[in-house]
A protein has these predicted regions:
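Flexible, compositionally biased loop and terminal segments
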Residues: 2-254
C-alpha cells in the first residue's frame, strides 16, 4: 500500500498518467571501473559501490510502480577481464543475495535471471537458485538480472531451438515468425514472457547498446546519462522516468 501511495504522489507531482509510465525499464549499469579509478580504489570496490546503487534503484522502481526492472550485471564479454575481477564480481553477487533476499521476498519482488548460467561459479549458481525458489511465487516488481548474457548468443540459441523443432517435425518452417523467436529468448516462455523494455537507460556517458536485449529493444526508448553508475541516484532515475512519460512513442507507425 505504501508503494502504491508513493506512485500516486509521483504521478500527481509530475502530472503523469499511470498509463504513460514504462512497464519495463532495462539498465546498462556502466561506469564502476571509472568510478573506482576516479576515487583511487580497487575495481572490486567500484563494483561494490555499483551494487549499493543498484539496491536503491530497485527500491525506487518498486515505489514508482514499475513492473519489470532488468539490469545488465555481467555480459558474455566480461569473461575477458582478469580472473580476480571476475571472481570478485560473482562473490559480490553471492553476498548480495545473502544480505538482501529476505527483504526482496518481503517486498514481493520476483527475481529472474537471463543468461547462460552453466559457466558461472557454483557458489553463484547456488545463490541464484535460492533467490529463484524463494521469490518464484511473488507477483510484485519483477527484478531480472542479465548474467553471463549476450544478445547475439541469446538469438543464436533461439535459432538452434527452432531449427531443432523443424528437424524433429514438431513445427513447420513457415511457422517460424517473430512470436516464435520471442518465445525462445531468455525473456520468453522460460521466464513467463517478460515484455520488451519500454525504456533502456545507460549510465557513464557511453552511447551504445553493447549486445544487450537487441531483439527486445526494437522499439525501446533510449536514455544516456553521463553519471557513472555508482553516482546514479534514485532521484535521477525518477527524473528519467518522468521525462519518458512525456515522450510520444510511435512504434514506427508515423
Amino acid at each position: 500500500m505504501a508503494a502504491d501511495r508513493a506512485a500516486t504522489l509521483f504521478m500527481e507531482r509530475n502530472m503523469t498518467d499511470k498509463e504513460r509510465l514504462p512497464r519495463h525499464v532495462a539498465v546498462i549499469m556502466d561506469g564502476n571501473g571509472r568510478w573506482a579509478q576516479k576515487n583511487k580504489v580497487s575495481r572490486l570496490a567500484g563494483h561494490n559501490a555499483g551494487m549499493l546503487a543498484m539496491k536503491e534503484i530497485i527500491k525506487r522502481a518498486d515505489v514508482l510502480g514499475i513492473k519489470y526492472l532488468t539490469v545488465y550485471a555481467f555480459s558474455t564479454e566480461n569473461w575477458k577481464r582478469s580472473q580476480e575481477e571476475v571472481g570478485g564480481i560473482f562473490g559480490l553477487l553471492v553476498k548480495y543475495v545473502a544480505s538482501e533476499l529476505k527483504e526482496l521476498n518481503e517486498n514481493n519482488v520476483k527475481v529472474a535471471v537471463l543468461g547462460d548460467l552453466k559457466k558461472i561459479p557454483r557458489s553463484a549458481q547456488a545463490s541464484i537458485d535460492k533467490a529463484l525458489s524463494t521469490t518464484g511465487e511473488n507477483d510484485g516488481l519483477h527484478f531480472n538480472i542479465a548474467l553471463n548474457y549476450g544478445s547475439r548468443q541469446e538469438i543464436a540459441r533461439a535459432a538452434r531451438r527452432l531449427a531443432g523443432r523443424v528437424l524433429s517435425g514438431e513445427m513447420d518452417l513457415c511457422e517460424i515468425d517473430e512470436a516464435a523467436v520471442s518465445r525462445d529468448l531468455y525473456t520468453g516462455e522460460e521466464n513467463g514472457f517478460i515484455p520488451d523494455p519500454d525504456l533502456i537507460i545507460r549510465t557513464s556517458g557511453e552511447e551504445r547498446i553493447s549486445n544487450f536485449l537487441l531483439w527486445q529493444a526494437a522499439y525501446s526508448e533510449l536514455t544516456f546519462t553521463d553519471s557513472l553508475w555508482p553516482y546514479f541516484t534514485p532521484d535521477e532515475f525518477e527524473q528519467i522516468i518522468c521525462d519518458y512519460a512525456q515522450r510520444e512513442r510511435r512504434f514506427g507507425g508515423r
